[in-house]
Amino acid sequence: QITKQVIEAGMTLGSHTWSHKDLARKPYATDLDLAKQEIEMGASAVHMAAGVPIAPFFRFPSLQHPPAMLIYLGERNIATFSTDIDSFDFRMHKPEQVIKSVMTKLEKRGKGIILMHDFQRGTAEALPELLRQLKAGGYKVVHMVPRQMLTTLPQYDDMVMKQDKLSSNNTRPENNVVHTIGQYIGGAPPATSDMHE
């Protein structure tokens, strides 16, 4: 449900692995087929939940980028995204702390990709004010849109179907993240929705 709302709101969805494993650690670091399975099943699951193809965009869990997996993703024409600024919002509970963390780091760097997690209530509550401060500071929120969508691989689609792990949960701690972002990138999101990392 949430994933479909994100798509309906005009957002771009990528993937982040099937079970959020650090692909730079064993067994994934030494078993490339297992690492590929983790990536591909994640993409298949998001595609199935969305009901439409997703962007060929990927971020590694723990921000670890194993060279062999970078090569694999390149062969699949999947763009990898990292981050320049980690909000560390998973360590904070108050919106003011999240805003201060992001703005302090952003002012030092001047620009960059900001990592935030939508499952944190403090993050969702901080987002409207953070976006206001970004706009007031002359920063832009950029909506990444792919030239073409990702084609998932049938064998991994089948694996996901057999797992039956797709959640039907359609709530997050603060159910306004997509709505808030949509106001800043020109989307027309539904009254209640959220985004998944």
Q: What residues fall within each predicted segment?
A:
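C-terminal domain-boundary segment and adjacent tail
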Residues: 122-196
